[in-house]
From Swiss-Prot:
Protein species of origin: Hepatitis B virus genotype A1 subtype adw (isolate Philippines/pFDW294/1988)
N-myristoyl glycine: lipidated positions: G2
Region (Pre-S1), start-end ranges: 2-119
Protein name: Large envelope protein
Homology family: Belongs to the orthohepadnavirus major surface antigen family.
Amino acid sequence: MGGWSSKPRKGMGTNLSVPNPLGFFPDHQLDPAFGANSNNPDWDFNPIKDHWPQANQVGVGAFGPGFTPPHGGVLGWSPQAQGILATVPAMPPPASTNRQSGRQPTPISPPLRDSHPQAMQWNSTAFHQALQDPRVRGLYFPAGGSSSGTLNPVPTIASHISSISSRIGDPAPNMENITSGFLGPLLVLQAGFFLLTRILTIPQSLDSWWTSLNFLGGAPVCLGQNSQSPTSNHSPTSCPPICPGYRWMCLRRFIIFLFILLLCLIFLLVLLDYQGMLPVCPLIPGSTTTSTGPCKTCTTPAQGNSMFPSCCCTKPTDGNCTCIPIPSSWAFAKYLWEWASVRFSWLSLLVPFVQWFVGLSPTVWLSAIWMMWYWGPSLYNILSPFIPLLPIFFCLWVYI
């Protein structure tokens, strides 16, 4: 290593006519640090080195005539240094042991208590002790903050957490809940608008049916077109404001609207009576009224707990209080039937007929259905304007 050896050289590198004692040329490893002065003759591993006697031949070298670097050129002995472009094929990626292809699902994040225990235990004694460490305190106290011995980490940690929340934002909302909560009212609104448009056609349809009764066998024509304000031929259901029949058309539609409103109120009354929300006291036997006296309580306790009274306290002429239970369903209908039976005694004769009709065999019911089917077209023309009201009645019946 330190100097030149006096031992005779062996093998290659013994010709000192080419001075290169320190390995100046690339890949010409004559530096003593590589063992040039040792007894190892195989220290130079250049695979394409020139034969040593050819070093003294005259040739055009990189440093002028008469000098040729003996080891493949000034730039080295690699293929790129010799001007040969060798393309090395890229190594294929190692075969994956995972047989599943495509993007794999994101793994579930660990709980906060495992990934950030300091956020879960910020008010504990152990965490306060951990804040004594400058490295931990630097995470929660900003630069230039308080560095006194007394620590009050609660507001600082709260502000730190709030700053983290302001950076990362709120969690992503559940789009499924938002979609379901948005589509529900939208469908209800669409169904309501459709029913409204259909209901608005009811007065016009009933008006057409009403006016057709005056023109049996012919096309209905407005009678006011030949008056002092003549108009073109038009239907009596679409009179212009200048037509004398316009006021009659408005009157007919107003009566139709009142009829539809009365029909809805009757249906609502029947529904409430069926649900037992009309606690009407029945008539006292042998009387036409339900006189309530000074009796405040019933002598017979009520059956069950209900928000409506379950009995009526009456005081006949004998002075004794009498308790009459209120039916849980159809109380108002029974009251009307009792009242009508007292006023019209002949209605009591219909009771056996009604009971017989209810107890008919299925054959009779099928015959009645067949007759209704036979008369169906004419009934449909009469009842078709009221078809849009059926969904509304059904919804009220189900949800009330």
